Amino acid sequence: MPRHSSVYAGLLQKKLQSHHCKVWLINTGWRGGKPGVGHRYPIQVTRALLSGVLHGNFDSIAFTKDSYFGLEVPSACPGVEKDMLNPMLAWQNHEDYRASASKLSSLFEANFKKFAGKVALDVCNAGPKPS
């Protein structure tokens, strides 16, 4: 019988901590705006980001924290333009980005409430922060 997803999340967290693993989230999806305006990331960008992770290129690069989702965003990557790294810079209309990011982070926050009390407090605090 499958267990609640919070059980598997806890097991993953313990394994990552005990083995001192780095975890990377690479956006290979959509950038630059809503459907009809934005575009998928080019495969060359995905490959450059993955190569950067595998070759340790991010070990000495500065990161900035995304104010909506709390993700650490690298300031540079060989072969990738800066606007491909920073989600807001990929959008022509920065106000549209802010509105969309705020709405999406609110949806994440609301959905995650069902996990309250089932996951560690640090996990709850790491989630999106709607503005």
Report residues per predicted region:
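Conserved NTP phosphate-binding and transfer environment spanning the P-loop NTPase/kinase superfamily
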Residues: M1-S131
